[in-house]
Swiss-Prot record:
Belongs to the bacterial histone-like protein family. Transmembrane segments: none annotated. It comes from the Bacteria. The lineage of its organism: Bacteria, Pseudomonadati, Pseudomonadota, Betaproteobacteria, Burkholderiales. GO terms for biological process: DNA recombination; regulation of DNA-templated transcription; regulation of translation. This is Integration host factor subunit beta. It comes from Herminiimonas arsenicoxydans. PANTHER family: DNA-BINDING PROTEIN HU, INTEGRATION HOST FACTOR SUBUNIT BETA.
Length: 101
């Protein structure tokens, strides 16, 4: 599901919401989540999951084109951990085909 599909589904599910308002709501939520992660905060949405930052240590990598060794610096990456309700809901789908767009 893309961001525009999420906005369309939100507007469809709540007819009192104008599509423009649904767009604003989704963008506001995503901006708030991005800002929180950018400042090192953890985000927890009960029943859905949590977002946090993981730190990846510096390492020596290889340039795939030349094969030369390259120093890859330390970096922080967002990490999502699904909540119990989400895990159970997804697990209940075992045996059903996965829909790929």
């Amino acid at each position: 599901m893309t961001k525009s599909e999420l906005i369309a589904r939100l507007a469809e599910r709540y007819p009192q919401l104008v599509a423009k308002d649904a767009d604003y709501a989704v963008k506001t939520i995503l901006d708030a989540m991005s800002d929180a992660l950018a400042t090192g905060q953890r985000i927890e949405i009960r029943g859905f999951g949590s977002f946090a930052l993981n730190s990846r240590p510096p390492r020596i990598g290889r340039n795939p084109k030349s094969g030369d060794k390259v120093m890859v610096p330390e970096k922080r990456v967002p990490h999502f951990k699904p909540g119990k309700q989400l895990r159970e809901r997804v697990d209940a789908m075992v045996g059903q085909p996965i829909i790929e767009d």
